[in-house]
Amino acid sequence: DSDVYISLAQRSKVANRAKADLFVSLHFNAAGSTSASGFESYALTPQYQASSKYPRPTSKDAKRYIGNAQDPWNTLITYHLERALVQGLGGPDRGIKRARWSVLKDLECPGVLTELGFVSHAETAKKVRSPAFRQKLAQSLYNGIVAYRKRLQRIQ
């Protein structure tokens, strides 16, 4: 065991080699403004669609990534994780968004990138240092994954 940094682009390769059934990329945001707060979850933007941050489509939106093969499942896991965070933490909920993050583009399994809060927000930074809050975060994420799995079992 070692603590080695793996680049965002490499993380999908690690998941693919492991033949992962699901990929959950957890992050904490930071912003220039100390008032920014809340959590948000991202699914890979489908081909020909504009991302949340750039709502006007461009020619780059026509590119298809390996991860786009999982579009329905990407959306489903993103929904269930965000819903579980709302139920477990309350908010503020910044919502479900679409982006072409490098960590999601080349996944061969469903994937989601979740921003768990802003460490530049004093109250959030304080909460994150608390083991009880981190346990609450972990439980919420677990609940979201379980809800996703149950939904898959009903569909298949």
What are these regions, as identified by a protein language model?
Residues 1-156:
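Active-site-proximal helix/loop segments of hydrolytic enzymes
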